[in-house]
């Protein structure tokens, strides 16, 4: 999204006069189940997030992972581990990428996870094989249980694409360190989920709506034109 994001974080870009991150958090707030929001930023964008957080009414912590560039970044999985270690987190986590929007409520995933009593992700049908090769792909059984998952597969085994929205049980959060030690892959959070699904049951909820991935200028302009908000 350069030059828009050269000196400005993508999650704070505006869609219909509201930052992407505000769309996500204001929706999640409706379930009244989240005790604290934690935003992990590199050092370069830290002050932007601090300014954004200044007038928020909910409990919010901004974490600086100490990195400056793409070349030195920790990767999403190590960022999550860094936050859990720094804040000594010992609770269930809802993990979301700040550059995606949904037209349905994320509280549906929370409710689904409470019903399944496992860590859970979401899935949607993707017919484009080339897009599947750039995403996390999860094959499931009749009960939505993940039976195979791979991040950016060369040969996708099914058409279920998994966007970066995850509900992790606290006991599974404790396995992140082990996953990193066993080289689960640390750039995309889906790499950890793929590893985790081979250790414990993980379910993948069929999405009841659409996801908008804001990856470049074209997709950003498209979202600004088409996004209608979250249907309840």
Residue ranges and their predicted role:
Residues 21, 83, 99, 138, ...:
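Residue-level signal for inorganic ion chemistry
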